[in-house]
């Protein structure tokens, strides 16, 4: 939860610096990170803090090469467990009985689109207006 709060505070602090270049993109990146951390913390609480609810699980291979029914966390390049994405987190939270408003989901989706464009290529139009509309 602390990381989520710190990420959002950083996003707001950077966004409020008028001469900070790339501030809208940085805001989108940090804001999405904040929402994802917050929602993952909420899901963990709903699941009695069982970490496997956040991990992408894969079957363990038997010695003969067949897949076992037992599963283990899939590891990333840094050998850390891979976690599910924000959309899967939202789905699991709702499956646990918590309703997330369509407005919130739409706002998060819009932030993700801005973040993805900032990270993977560029935003063709000014995103400051779109970010202000999300606020």
Question: Language-model features: where?
Answer:
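Short, solvent-exposed secondary-structure capping/transition elements
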Residues: 39-52, 120, 124-131
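Charged alpha-helical initiation segments
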Residues: 1-33, 42-48, 52-53
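Short, charged/polar, low-complexity loop and linker segments
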Residues: 12-16, 89-96, 116-121
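Flexible secondary-structure boundary motifs
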Residues: 56-103, 113-114
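Charge-rich, low-complexity amphipathic helices
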Residues: 26, 33, 49, 56-64, ...
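Charge-enriched, short contiguous segments at helix-coil
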Residues: 96-135
């Amino acid at each position: 939860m602390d990381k989520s709060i710190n990420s959002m505070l950083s996003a707001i602090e950077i966004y409020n610096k008028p001469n900070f270049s790339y501030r809208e993109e940085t805001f989108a990146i940090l804001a999405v990170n904040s929402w994802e951390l917050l929602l993952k913390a909420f899901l963990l609480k709903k699941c009695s803090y069982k970490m496997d609810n956040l991990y992408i699980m894969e079957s363990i291979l038997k010695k003969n090469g067949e897949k076992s029914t037992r599963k283990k966390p899939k590891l990333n390049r840094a050998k850390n467990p891979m976690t599910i994405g924000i959309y899967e987190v939202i789905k699991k939270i709702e499956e646990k009985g918590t309703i997330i408003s369509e407005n919130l989901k739409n706002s998060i989706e819009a932030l993700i689109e801005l973040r993805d464009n900032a990270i993977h290529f560029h935003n063709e139009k000014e995103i400051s207006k779109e970010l202000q509309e999300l606020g």
